[in-house]
Amino acid sequence: MFGKSKQLADQNAALEKQLQPLLEMFTAMQSSLAFIEFTPEGVITKVNDNFSRVTGYSSAELIGQHHQLLCDKSEVESSRYRDFWKHLNNGESFSGEVLRKHKNGHDIWLEANYFPIKDSEDRVVKIFKIANDVTARVEHARSNDSLLSAIDRSMAIIEFDMKGRITHA
């Protein structure tokens, strides 16, 4: 009996030793990234402080609400949105930039990774999302694109022949 207890204690200590670096990594990630967890149906079950900060909603305001709360109405009504959740429920992950709505109504861009979590019977039991606010980067890129487009539209193009005469203006 005592030998079995010693063996279990040793196994437990070994597992704790393996788990420690994972806990440290998770803690580091939680301090800098936004985390949110959903049911397979899209109901919010957990958020971290970073997610609340990025969206403007407190955890109490988010938990129990559907993912739709964070999306534009036109997106929610789209077939693309239904397909997005269908793919997640089929166990397919998603990574990319997504447009979401802040509590005050302004647009926020997130670099998001959605991970379906499965049980031992291969059923999706929850969806885990890790996100980073990239709004400033996306808006800066769009501003640059608009500026370059305006320059392209306003530039004059003049063609000359070999003698310097204008052939097309």
Listing of model-derived features with the role each one plays in the protein:
Residues 45, 89, 94, 99-108, 118-119, 167:
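PAS-family sensory domains
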Residues 16-47, 142-169:
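Sensory modules in modular signal-transduction proteins
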Residues 2, 9-12, 120-121, 125-153:
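Sensory coupling linkers of modular signal transduction proteins
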